């Protein structure tokens, strides 16, 4: 007995035959019948386009010539899901044939939750890079201005200068972290990557302690009414640069013994070594808010009627510190906020946090340097001095100041006449 053909082979031959006949008149008739069976019947008189199926699989019904036909977007195409509430468009041409090109431009892909998360993550990364670039650029300009303008180098501006320096170093180490840390480095947990993390956290802490120095200076000058001449630069150097160092050393020792993995980034469940440096940051932030509450209270009561230039400077400094402390406080407290499971809340949290975290340096340079009236006045004087030195008017004035009269008697002629 000769065995008959297998069912799988018959199915393969049938599919092959259907594929070969797809563009044939027989296939066109099958397509037309298929579309007519799926779509409601439409009666048209005159020239018309027959029902057809395009390469994507969308059925286009029998339509009158010149008509722009709309059909829902395909639900799936090449494994990608699309929004079927939008439409694709195809024109029935005057010769009774369908346009070769179908307009599927309004068909949008329905992103999965994983794809949406990746998209928002990439946008947040772009915001972070943009913000840190802008911040670093403006901070460097502010640093150069404070360095060059020696006429405004008082204790208050020296504190501003050091705060800007701390932000520059923090932004620079952020770029080092982003450009050198990758999954392989994280897993290797080499010494240099742990040192980079420690340096970044150190400069992060110095930002808060220099803000604390700003608050201490204003509180001493306004609330305690001490003469600021009694304050010394070394006191603020100790607050801003020295105190954070043992804090980070203690944190590094804790990480080394209890959480020594992934270049000391992140934290394991049940391990709280990061609070060694986060705790002091929160503490000085709260103390600064108390300082500013007292400062604002004094300014609103005792100094309201005063219009001296020193009081105006204090008021501007308080406004800048209030804004910056709010920014620093909000961004840091956001790390302790749970945005919840709602997708919109998480998206807002990601973007808001990325923006404030990356643009902090920009706000610091704007409020403490570019809007500082002393800096602006000194820059204006420098600019006018430079203009006077290099202007054509100055050259002409210098040239005309030289005596050129024909009655001028030279020293040589006097010498000759006396000799005679």
From Swiss-Prot:
Annotated keywords: Cell membrane, Disulfide bond, G-protein coupled receptor, Glycoprotein, Membrane, Receptor, Signal, Transducer, Transmembrane, Transmembrane helix
Main subcellular localisation: membrane
InterPro entries documented for this protein: GPCR_2, GPCR_2-like_7TM, GPCR_2_CRF1_rcpt, GPCR_2_CRF_rcpt, GPCR_2_extracell_dom_sf, GPCR_2_extracellular_dom, GPCR_2_secretin-like, GPCR_2_secretin-like_CS
SUPFAM superfamilies in UniProt: Family A G protein-coupled receptor-like, Hormone receptor domain
Residue ranges, Extracellular side: 29-116, 180-194, 259-274, 337-343
Alphabetical list of Gene3D superfamilies matching this protein: GPCR, family 2, extracellular hormone receptor domain, Rhodopsin 7-helix transmembrane proteins
Glycosylated sites: 43, 50, 83, 95, 103
Transmembrane segments: 117-147, 155-179, 195-223, 231-258, 275-300, 312-336, 344-373
Membrane topology: Multi-pass membrane protein
Gene Ontology process terms (BP): adenylate cyclase-activating G protein-coupled receptor signaling pathway; cell surface receptor signaling pathway; cellular response to corticotropin-releasing hormone stimulus; corticotropin secretion; regulation of corticosterone secretion
Signal peptide coordinates: 1-28
GO CC, alphabetical: neuron projection; plasma membrane
Entry keyword annotation includes Ribosomal protein: no
Pfam family, one: 7tm_2
MF terms (GO), sorted A to Z: corticotrophin-releasing factor receptor activity; corticotropin-releasing hormone binding; corticotropin-releasing hormone receptor activity; G protein-coupled peptide receptor activity
Disulfide bonds: 35-59, 49-92, 73-107, 193-263
Cytoplasmic-facing ranges: 148-154, 224-230, 301-311, 374-420
Cell compartment(s), UniProt: Cell membrane
Record family assignment: Belongs to the G-protein coupled receptor 2 family.
Subunit field text: Interacts (via N-terminal extracellular domain) with CRF and UCN.
Function, as annotated: G-protein coupled receptor for CRH (corticotropin-releasing factor) and UCN (urocortin). Has high affinity for CRH and UCN. Ligand binding causes a conformation change that triggers signaling via guanine nucleotide-binding proteins (G proteins) and down-stream effectors, such as adenylate cyclase. Promotes the activation of adenylate cyclase, leading to increased intracellular cAMP levels.
Domains (record comment): The transmembrane domain is composed of seven transmembrane helices that are arranged in V-shape. Transmembrane helix 7 assumes a sharply kinked structure.
Official protein name in the record: Corticotropin-releasing factor receptor 1
Species in which this protein is naturally found: Gallus gallus
Organism classification: Eukaryota, Metazoa, Chordata, Craniata, Vertebrata
């Amino acid at each position: 007995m000769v065995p008959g053909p297998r069912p799988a082979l018959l199915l393969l031959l049938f599919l092959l035959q259907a594929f070969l006949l797809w563009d044939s008149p027989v296939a066109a008739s099958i397509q037309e019948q298929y579309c007519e069976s799926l779509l409601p019947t439409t009666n048209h008189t005159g020239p018309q386009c027959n029902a057809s199926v395009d390469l994507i699989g969308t059925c286009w019904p029998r339509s009158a010539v010149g008509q722009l036909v709309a059909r829902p977007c395909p639900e799936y195409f090449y494994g990608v899901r699309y929004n079927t509430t939008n439409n694709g468009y195809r024109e029935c041409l005057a010769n009774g044939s369908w346009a070769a090109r179908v307009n599927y431009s309004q068909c949008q892909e329905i992103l999965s939750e994983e794809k949406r998360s990746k998209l928002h993550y990439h946008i947040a990364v772009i915001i972070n890079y943009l913000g840190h670039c802008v911040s670093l650029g403006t901070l460097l300009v502010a640093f150069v201005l404070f360095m060059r303008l020696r006429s405004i180098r008082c204790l208050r501006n020296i504190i501003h200068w050091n705060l800007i320096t701390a932000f520059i170093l923090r932004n620079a180490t952020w770029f080092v972290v982003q450009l050198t840390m990758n999954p392989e480095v994280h897993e290797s947990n080499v010494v240099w990557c742990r040192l980079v993390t420690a340096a970044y956290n150190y400069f992060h802490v110095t930002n808060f302690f220099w803000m604390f120095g700003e608050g201490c200076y204003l509180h001493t000058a306004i609330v305690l009414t001490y003469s600021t001449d009694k304050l010394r630069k070394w006191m603020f150097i100790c607050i801003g640069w020295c105190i954070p160092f043992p804090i980070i050393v203690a944190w590094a020792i804790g990480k080394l013994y209890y959480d020594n993995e992934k270049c000391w980034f992140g934290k394991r469940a049940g391990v709280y070594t990061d609070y060694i440096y986060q705790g002091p940051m929160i503490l000085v932030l709260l103390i600064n808010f108390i300082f500013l509450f007292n400062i604002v209270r004094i300014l609103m009561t005792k100094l309201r009627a005063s219009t001296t230039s020193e009081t105006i400077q204090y008021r501007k400094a308080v406004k800048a510190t209030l804004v910056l402390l709010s920014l620093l406080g909000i961004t840091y407290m956001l790390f302790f906020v749970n945005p919840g499971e709602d997708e919109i809340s998480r998206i807002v949290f990601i973007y808001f946090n990325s923006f404030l975290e990356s643009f902090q340096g920009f706000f610091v340079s704007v409020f403490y340097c570019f809007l500082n009236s002393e800096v602006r006045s000194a820059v204006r004087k420098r600019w006018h001095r430079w203009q006077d030195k290099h202007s054509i008017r100055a050259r002409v004035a210098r040239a005309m100041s030289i005596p050129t009269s024909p009655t001028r008697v030279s020293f040589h002629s006097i010498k000759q006449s006396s000799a005679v």
